[in-house]
Amino acid sequence: MEELKRQLDQMSEHNRKHYNYELSKLSEAEKQRLEALVVRMVKSGAKKPFEWAWSEFREGIPQWARFMVLKGMYQSAYDIPGNIDGSDEFDQETSNTYQEIVDKLGKEKLHQFLTSYAKSMLYNMIGIFDEGNFDYESNDSWLLMTQDRESGELGKPISGLHEDFLEFDQEIELS
């Protein structure tokens, strides 16, 4: 229960008392399960691993999966060099155009714009993932779900991504 203690020690006194009370009601097996979730969130780079793990533990929401989807999207938005390289697949002039814009605006200003633009596009995509199909003449829709890698068995839906996306940069360490 080392990581649980470490996370509780970082909380305000009020929150620490609340969660210590909640933890006192758990069995040893439940505490170990929560500890494993917290450790998993720490290893994933969450700034608030206890909150994410507690939500998964208490509400049954696949928060680790939600966190990893959002983290991957955010990392993609910040990967300007990788996105410029990848965009060459769609327009071979992209690298030249990028350099022309850098020469006029500067790299920092352009990267700030491109990151915001990428986040906006990703947020729109999240709406598609979260809401499914708006074509009401079709019975087909979709759902983002967890899946067991070994068995292929489908797990729980990964939904509500839009709820955390806008402020997600406060949830992770970006390198």
State where each predicted segment sits.
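Acidic, proline/glycine-rich low-complexity IDRs
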Residues: 1-21, 95-96, 126-175
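Conserved, folded interaction/cargo-binding domains in eukaryotic regulatory proteins
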Residues: 113-131
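Generic hydrophobic segment detector
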Residues: 52-56, 75-89, 112-116, 160-175
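Mature extracytoplasmic domains of secretory-pathway proteins
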Residues: 98-119
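N-terminal low-complexity, intrinsically disordered segments
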Residues: 2-105
